[in-house]
Amino acid sequence: VAYTAGPGLIGSLMVGETVAKTISNVLDIELLPINHLEGHILAPGLEDENLETPYLCLLVSGGHTQIIECSEYGSYQILGETVDDACGEAFDKVGKLLNLDYPGGPKVSKLAEGGNPARFNFPRALMKDKNLNFSFSGLKTAVLYALEDLEEKDYPDVAASFQEAVVDVLIRSEEHTS
C-alpha cells in the first residue's frame, strides 16, 4: 500500500498514513511511503514507459515551483526554484484579490479566458538572470496595485495578463535549460 509521506499538509498526510497502515495491517501487505514531489517528478513515466534518463522536470504545484534534473530513479538535482511564492501560491493569492473562491488557480484561468492578456504589462522577474530561479511575489504585488484603480469588469484582463506573465516566466526557464 503506497501513501504520500510528504511534503504536504500535516492533517492530510496523517490521515493518508493512518488509512494506509490500517489497510497494510489488515491485508498483511507491504507499506510504501512515497514522497509527493517524487511522484510529480516520475509522472512522465506513466505516459511513456520507455522514458529515458536523464530528463528535466518543470515541477509546478501548489507549493513548489522547481526545475529538477532526474539523472536516474531516486537521483534528483534542483537546478532552479522559487525564491519566494510558488506559482500555485501566486495563483491562489491573485484569485483572492480577484474575489474568486479557493483554489484560485483554476478560477483565475477560467476568468482569463475572457480577458486580454496584453492589456497589463505585469513584471516578469528574473527573466534575464542566468540562473533558473523563479520569483512571483512582485507579480502578485503588481496585480494588487493594478486592482486599486479598476472595476470588476476589468478583472478578466487582469487575470489574463497575470497568467500570461506567469507562463512567460515558466517558458523562459524551459528555454534556458534547452
Q: Which stretches of residues belong to each language-model region?
A:
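Conserved phosphate-binding catalytic cores of ATP/NTP-utilizing and phosphoryl-transfer enzymes
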Residues: 29, 33-56
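Glycine-rich phosphate-binding loop plus the immediately following alpha-helix
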Residues: 49, 61, 72-116, 140-151
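A short glycine/serine-rich beta->alpha loop
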Residues: 5-10, 78-82, 128-131
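Short beta-strand-loop/turn "lid" adjacent to the catalytic site in phosphate-handling enzymes
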Residues: 1-21, 25
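Short beta-strand scaffold segments in enzyme catalytic cores
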Residues: 57-59, 65-69
